[in-house]
Regions:
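Amphipathic alpha-helix face/heptad-repeat signature
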Residues: 76-80, 249-252, 304, 308, ...
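Intrinsically disordered or highly flexible coil/loop and linker segments, enriched in small
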Residues: 55-59, 148, 181-185, 204-208, ...
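C-terminal subdomains that position terminal phosphate/3'-OH groups for nucleotidyl transfer/ligation
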Residues: 285-421, 433, 451
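Acidic, low-complexity proline/glycine-rich segments
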Residues: 44-56, 340-344
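Sequence-structural signature of the catalytic-core scaffold of metal-dependent phosphohydrolases
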Residues: 2-38, 50-61, 81, 85-86, ...
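Acidic, carboxylate-rich catalytic segments that either coordinate divalent cations
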Residues: 1-28, 32-35, 385, 394-452
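A short small-residue
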Residues: 61-71, 354-359
Length: 452
């Protein structure tokens, strides 16, 4: 059993796929380019995420403001690209420090660290359902209602927990490891290093915190066991591991971006003034730095850029300070930002507090979030009973047969599927929808407007 991680293993470029019931190493044609080719293995990872359908769909998924009409408001796609940019800078900075300290393995460059973090950042939100975190809550709520337990009675505890706890992080892993590119045959077949850096919560729903946050469904557990062994992740119990150190950089990049860029959206939507944003950023910037800005929008953007740069420096220093604990799997901090300078902590805390009081509780946002529950619920009302009728009862009413046709172009439910497999396919389908397509399907299913 590993008691300490090392960078040689943590930067593994090995890829895996299932074969004959086992998870085995694999090499695909594009990974035979070699170390001196135009693309490194980590750049190949990046390209696979960028060209995936799941990544493209993020363009119509909520970041903070559902179905926003404003052209400059962030969605999950723009958020992910910006997080990846910050993550790359963070990784490159740490990579240089690791190299200068003699920690970087021979054959690896500082930019390899940046590329791995960039890939993880780019993929971290692929599994977010329509309407963001409210969509997660709506999917969980439906499967946890007492009247719906009849559909789950024959599932074992781990399977039931998975179905009742839709988790965007776990679905991001499921997309890259099982669904996209090579469906049920290794997914995107990313490098072990990129997969490890993506795991913010490397455990299943069986973990004490698993009903809140987790990264591993039962469907991906055999795959992750093999990846964890390849990376040399420290075991933290049954099917639970200490985090890959680079996952902390991915997490920090995400936190920095959503804390500061949510404020920029709020200014665009007239929910906050630029003066309020400048006040929040004052501890990490100085007003004179943007004195020549020609507009309040440009001024906010310049100050935001300075603040992000300061935060990147601080996080990189904090990472190196705690590198030994991260490699031992004994890091005790909530995250890296919690151990950064008071200036960084205060700025992000104030930004999140302002967002909570002035943005997240705004009337128009609340209305859309309330509507998310009946919207996604109506789709599950149709699909889950149909899947149950096919598999458990072996007979379908006409409406149920029509309902299952909706999944035919995606990942059709088959009579030989288990109920767990069928419900995971339904969650793949609904969770993969954009805000617009989910809203349109719910409206169409209601029959409203069908007659002109």
């Amino acid at each position: 059993m590993n008691t300490r991680m090392n960078w040689q293993n943590l930067l593994s470029t090995q890829r895996f796929r299932p074969k004959n019931g086992e998870i085995v190493p694999t090499v695909t044609p594009s990974t035979q380019e070699g170390a001196d080719a135009l693309r490194t293995d980590f750049h190949i990872d990046y390209d696979r995420v960028v060209f995936s359908g799941a990544f493209r769909r993020l363009g119509r998924k909520t970041q903070v403001h559902p179905l926003a009409q404003h052209d400059l408001t962030h969605n999950r796609l723009t958020h992910s690209v910006e997080v990846a940019s910050v993550g790359r800078s963070l990784g490159n900075r740490v990579g240089v420090m690791l190299h200068n300290g003699g920690f970087l393995p021979q054959g690896n460059t500082p930019s390899d660290i940046g590329a791995v973090v960039q890939v993880a950042c780019l993929a971290h939100d692929l599994g977010n359902p329509p309407f963001g975190h409210t969509g997660e809550d709506a999917l969980r709520d439906w499967f946890r209602r007492p009247e719906h337990q009849i559909y789950l009675n024959t599932l074992n505890e781990a399977e039931r927990n998975d179905i009742q706890t839709y988790e965007g992080n776990a679905h991001s892993l499921r997309i890259v490891a099982s669904l996209e590119m090579y469906p049920e045959a290794g997914g995107m077949r990313l490098t072990a290093a990129a997969i490890g850096a993506l795991l913010k919560y490397p455990w299943t729903t069986q973990h004490p915190n698993g009903r809140k946050k987790f990264n591993i469904y039962q469907t991906e557990l055999p795959f992750i066991r093999q990846v964890a062994d390849e990376l040399g992740l420290v075991s933290a119990g049954a099917d639970s591991w200490a985090r890959h150190p680079l996952s902390y950089l991915m997490e920090a990049a995400d936190d920095i971006c959503y804390a500061l860029l949510d404020l920029e959206d709020a200014v665009e939507l007239d929910l906050l003034t630029d003066t309020e944003v400048e006040s929040i950023l004052s501890e990490l910037t100085f007003a004179e730095s943007a004195w020549h800005a020609s507009s309040s929008r440009q001024r906010c953007a310049m100050l935001r850029g300075i603040a992000i740069g300061k935060a990147i420096d601080d996080v990189a220093q904090t990472f190196m300070l705690h590198q030994s604990d991260l490699l031992d799997g004994t890091f005790k901090g909530k995250d890296l930002l919690a151990l950064c300078s008071p200036q960084v902590q205060n700025t992000l805390a104030k930004a999140k507090e302002l967002a909570q009081t002035r943005i997240f509780r705004h009337h128009t946002k609340l209305l859309t979030e309330i509507a998310t529950f009946p919207c996604l619920g109506s789709i599950l009302d149709l699909l889950v009973p149909a899947a149950y009728a096919l598999i458990a009862e072996k007979q379908l009413a006409t409406r149920q047969s029509l309902a299952l046709e909706l999944l035919k172009k995606h990942n059709p439910i088959l009579p030989e599927d288990s109920l767990y497999q069928a419900y995971m396919k339904i969650l793949d389908f609904v969770g993969g929808m954009t805000d617009n397509s989910a809203a349109k399907m719910a409206q169409d299913l209601s029959g409203v407007g069908i007659l002109c």
